[in-house]
């Protein structure tokens, strides 16, 4: 007969095995954890996890062994390193650079007209009203198309 301590020990092993199995991807099914899959490899991996727990290994050691044997994609939570950060942050960086280039071109286009107009009349004595009129005449009208995309 199993003692109460044996039953508790089996329950602890079972709960640890289930917890680890929920975080390990089935290599055949792809989208299922090995806990939910009935593929042969999933059954084999569940048995391997239970055997490793019974031999006294920690969860971290089991995850490392699985990752070493089957690659990083077997785990649902891949490690966060420089390459992963670059992959996740690259769209934000590209968007920021594109917005910066757009804003720079927009600002540069607006300021160049005023600089050119002021350089045109450098040394010519003009009243402030005449300067304002000259800038109004030389400044191109805003585009009729208010959309950022030319086709709209």
From Swiss-Prot:
This protein's membrane topology, according to the annotation, is: Single-pass membrane protein
The UniProt transmembrane annotation reads: 84-104
Residues that bind heme, according to the entry? 26, 29
**Subcellular localization:** Mitochondrion inner membrane
One GO biological process this protein is involved in is: embryo development ending in seed dormancy
Write out the entry's keywords from A to Z. Answer: Cytochrome c-type biogenesis, Heme, Iron, Membrane, Metal-binding, Mitochondrion, Mitochondrion inner membrane, Transmembrane, Transmembrane helix
Report the family membership. Belongs to the CcmH/CycL/Ccl2/NrfF family.
Name this protein carries in UniProt: Cytochrome c-type biogenesis CcmH-like mitochondrial protein
Please tell me the species this chain comes from: Oryza sativa subsp. indica (Rice)
* Gene behind this protein: CCMH
């Amino acid at each position: 007969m199993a003692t109460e301590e044996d039953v508790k020990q089996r329950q602890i092993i079972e709960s640890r095995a289930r917890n680890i199995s929920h975080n390990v991807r089935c290599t055949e099914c792809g989208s299922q954890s090995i806990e939910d899959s009935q593929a042969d490899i999933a059954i084999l991996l569940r048995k391997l996890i239970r055997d490793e727990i019974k031999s006294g290994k920690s969860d971290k050691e089991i995850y490392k062994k699985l990752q070493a044997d089957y690659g990083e994609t077997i785990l649902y939570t891949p490690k966060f390193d420089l390459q992963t950060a670059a992959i996740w942050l690259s769209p934000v960086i590209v968007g920021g650079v594109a917005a910066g280039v757009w804003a720079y071109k927009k600002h540069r286009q607006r300021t160049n007209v005023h600089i050119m107009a002021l350089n045109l009349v450098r040394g010519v004595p003009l009243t402030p009203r005449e300067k304002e009129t000259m800038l109004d005449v030389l400044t191109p009208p805003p585009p009729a198309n208010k959309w950022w995309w030319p086709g709209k």
